[in-house]
Amino acid sequence: ASLRLWPYDTPSGSVLVYGPGLLRTAALRDSTVHLTGDTAAPAGLEVWGPRGADAVTWNGRAVPTVATGADSLRAVAPLPGVPKLRLPALGGWRARTENPESAPGFDDSAWRVADKKASHSTTPVPEGRPVLFADDYGFHYGDVWYRGTLTDAAGLESVKLSYSTGTLGLLMAWLDGEPLGTHRMPVPDNSTIRKGTWTDTAVFEVPGQLRAGGRHVLSVLVRRMAHDQDGASRDTHKAARGLTAVSFTGGAPKAVWRIQGEAAPDPVRGPLNNGGLYGERAGWHLPGFPDGDWEPVAFPRAEWRQGVTWYRTTFRLAVPTGVDASVGLTLQDDPGRAYRAQIFLNGWNLGQYVNDVGPQHTFVLPNGILRTRGTNTLALAVLSEARTASGPGRVELTLLGGTAGGVPVAAVHSPGR
């Protein structure tokens, strides 16, 4: 019972309140005790206040009370609990595939040429090779693309791509638009759980039909998975991210590399909101983006494709005034399916779901970004490895909790297209 007993000091004297799940504020004006707070279920209310207090309000509404022999005011009826809240099913999805950067004819003339000889990173630059580290070209967050134009590539048998990422980083490659495959960093175990930077080399065999001489285009997408936090101040946050070196066997082609990462930072959502996916740079995650010509689809999905597919939908919530509801987005699928989904709500990046690793399946949709009394835009950027069918599987809104009361939350500015 003491868990529902709330002492509160006011300039007019102390107040003791029994009953509600949470007391937020108490104030005495004239002879009325004004209370605000939350109730998850119907609850009684009893108030002990300074001498002369003879009335009570709860969240701005008068509460009929009776005086007791214990010098308290007791509510005649319980305070109301939270009404039953219903969340809509998510439907009306539309989809579009991307990664045109993998096509040999893609126009990369506006991309940065990766030809630096020295780096600000603590990672050594391979001797005689250009710097490929993304940060040295101004790309610090999210995914980064590379395109290498190869000449004199006759006899090329395999490609070796060395790269550096944070936890669970991955790399996928295409040659002349044909998928070469995906490589990913291992899932940490107890001995590596605190490891901040992961490095490895992916080796891809070149298909026979692509071994002819002439011009070829090698396209590489790296999911960098953030920088080391460097809590010990050892400059580990300066370790390279992205490709670190490229080599070939069976041939010695000349390579000219170009790099593209995130666009200019969103002036409202900030630089951490977006990476270098084509859809991110084109605003596919934003409210109001014209997706009317996208393909209508339904979940669950089973796509066999290396690369990125975007899914968009809208949904409307109608949480009653005076109710504080916490809502999450839950994704569920066969854990053997290898794909990831970046989650954007009203243009805001709320996290990444890794289906075959987890453990997180529910992502909080913060009120303010979430319009609890309005229309919302949800976008998923799904990165598929192609070694399994990829989803999404089941995607649904989840009620994480609700109370009558709460604190009003202003809508967060979420500009769109």
Regions found by a protein language model. Give the residues of each.
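Non-catalytic C-terminal accessory domains or segments of carbohydrate-active enzymes
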Residues: A1-L370, T377, L383-R417
